[in-house]
Amino acid sequence: MKRERHQDVFTERLPAKAAQDAKQLRKLAGDWLKLRRADAELSQADLAARLGLKYYTFISQVENGFSRVPTEIMGAWARELGLEQAAFARHLLMYYEPELYRLLFGAESK
């Protein structure tokens, strides 16, 4: 069964009362990444292979909030998901560094 691709994958915002706990924010980012991977119809193993990662379990670690997408492969990760690189990086910054995101783009920016 083919999954319907989400129309605007960058419209999500952090919940207004989201705890600024890094683990919780990484989990929210991981949930978003998992949806994008599903939209691209890739398994964790497929994505890991395309990114040149030795272990596909790293994808699971990121999607479950135990790790972050490394900056060095962020562009490649975006490409493999069919997303624009700068928008992908900006969206992840919202979760990984919310205060920096706010300073750069303002509180109401998406």
Task: Kindly label every feature range from the protein language model.
Residues 3-39:
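A short, Lys/Arg-rich alpha-helix, primarily the initiator
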Residues 5-8, 70-88:
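DNA major-groove recognition helix of helix-turn-helix/homeodomain DNA-binding modules
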Residues 79, 87-110:
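Short, charged recognition helix plus adjacent turn
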